Amino acid sequence: MIGTIAVLHGREPTSAEIREIEAWKKPTGILWIRSYQGRERIPDVRLISGSSGEICHHELGMVFWLDPAQVMFSSGNREEKQRMMRLVRPGERVADMFAGIGYFSIPAGMAGATVHAMEIHPVAYRYLLRNIDENRLENRIFAGLGDCRELLFGTYDRIIMGHFDSSLMLDAAFEHIRNGGTIHMHTAGRNPPFIPEEYRDACRDAGTVRRIKKVAPHTWHYVLDMRAG
């Protein structure tokens, strides 16, 4: 559930499964999201029953406004949000290169970091601004609309790359990470990722991999942590 809407991924639900969800969760609507398209991660979505629209989702003491038919949100990333809140230290300068509606920017800001949140999708960016305001983080999170490669500036203690195509933009991340800083690169595949050969000399170790969730048959969402230096 995201707010009052049941959001389903993967194969199309059966009529029996839909009835079970309606009886158990009593959602205002059921959305089936086939996939997310392009860099803007626009949902390929079908409304199965009820209605959809803007909702308020509460998670880990944070507030997220969104329309799940227009922007991406994954409740399966809850543990990764918690991990960011544990890892981030007050005073850190954090870049969130694919901020979306604030999935990781809000937790980092709550942990006391100064966050530079970047998003290319105008609708997601609008919700990002709203969620910064709703969580009273205007003095910690500073948002920018556009291509993250053009918005990065200075150096950061931590860079979050929460997009499955983030490996294509590692050049930009390594240009802006401080010596000893950490890059969290999200990716999807059958097997755990590894640090690309061209970046191994820029890393202190072989990296740490976390498996987050299954996103398709034989395909998993992973996060690779890399320490620069």
PLM region descriptions:
Residues 1-3, 7-9, 14-76:
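Non-catalytic substrate-recognition/targeting regions of SAM-dependent transferases
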Residues 75-90:
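Conserved alpha-helix/loop element of class I SAM-dependent methyltransferases that forms part
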Residues 91-100:
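Conserved class I S-adenosyl-L-methionine
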Residues 95, 116-118:
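Conserved beta-strand positions in the Rossmann-like core of class I SAM-dependent methyltransferases
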Residues 101-113:
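Conserved SAM-binding loop of SAM-dependent methyltransferases across substrates and taxa
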Residues 118-158, 164-167:
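S-adenosyl-L-methionine
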Residues 167, 181-229:
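C-terminal catalytic and target-recognition region of SAM-dependent MTase-like enzymes
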Residues 170-179:
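A short glycine-rich, Lys/Arg-flanked "PGG" loop and its adjoining helix->strand segment in the class I
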